[in-house]
Amino acid sequence: MKRITIISLLTIAVMALSATSCKVQKKASETSSTTGIVVPSTPNQDPTAPVVYFTSDISPEGLVKIYEALGVKPFGRVAVKISTGESEESNHLRPDFIKNLVNTVNGTLVECNTAYGGNRATTELHRKAIAERGFEKVATVDIMDSEGDMQIPVVDSKHIKYDIVGAHLQNYDFMINLAHFKGHTMGGFGGVLKNQSIGVASSRGKLYIHSAGRTTSRWLDDDQDGFLESMAAAAQAVHNYFKQEGKDII
């Protein structure tokens, strides 16, 4: 049975990378002194709490170092979940910045189409945008809902009954959630959780989350609290999907 690993990275002035494995925590203390990566120590810290890695080396090489500090080896088909950005001026992670990491893990860049119009609303338009931004020069790019979507179970939600994700998600054994931090007019902040929920959702799934479970066919955004709760539930659903498949999440 395949294992699926998700690693979440966050970029904001420093790079932060969290993992929940005690084994990884031990590895972090062994590697931080040689890589320049700082792992803050907290008195009486819960041994099961995530470890957060920080580095001031905001470069392609620094991104690889903070990934390697985990001591986790990729396997099988590796998906690197990014945001391709709505325009050249948006704050998405640039291809040159992520290239070394993607090549290190032999990854496929993955995304899903948007649900609000714009230049990523269809697979054809999205492919054009991906080419214009230069992502295809880094690696193969898979639009995961280009051939439809699938439902995965949701547990802790009073709004959505399931999460609708790109069908190609099931094709990967190992996923890196590579997110950038930003202010977001609806979500408050965009980052790892948004990239794992809205980002992995298909176009229909995005409408379902934004409408707090009311529709998959039109844009509704009048229930802000319901949307935020649905987004959190969708992120949890992706996590639980991997766990229930008998795989793994790191």
Regions found by a protein language model. Name each.
Residues 18-21:
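C-terminal motif of bacterial Sec signal peptides marking the signal peptidase cleavage site
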Residues 23-25:
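Bacterial signal peptide processing site
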Residues 1-8:
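Bacterial N-terminal signal peptides that target proteins for export
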Residues 9-15:
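Hydrophobic alpha-helical targeting segments used for export or membrane insertion
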Residues 36, 43-104, 108-250:
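Extended, low-polarity segments enriched in aliphatic/aromatic residues
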